[in-house]
């Protein structure tokens, strides 16, 4: 699995999770076979403003690489500035969060709220890509706002055309949040719609879940979130 020029070694990625994805968690995931981990989501504005909380979140050690940083933002100036600042720390990938459905995030037009405005999303992605150099930019998406407003094919294409190296697709809508069963069939459609790698995400709790998602949808990689909580064995058992 490659993101731009970055070879992850395998298809297993650990999702950025608030209050979870700290250094000990990431190191354990790596020891059990994860190819790429992420720091928790961090505000682009917080990085620009040198807020201690934001800077502390994305601190990582060299032995954690490859490692990614996920940014939260809706402003091209803040996002491009944050990407330039992050280059000092040499992350291996930078993700734009367009998938968080939590109300305290979406009410400020962050996260999954951006799904309603693909034009703005494209501008945000391009602003990051233009200053990222060799660092691949990925985009975390959901299927759309609701079952009646699914626009994942449009947003995935916008991400590709704006220069993203991959899209990460959580197979639920914003309104569904983490309820109901994920809709993996959309991953097949996204794979047919874009040329960049597609990373599947949503209800991967066992090695069998990982295996089935890859086999049924042909995604290039998977991102495991809640399934890795207290269960790093999901990575080693899948690989074995």
Residue ranges and their predicted role:
Residues 1-240:
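Flavin-dependent oxidoreductase catalytic cores
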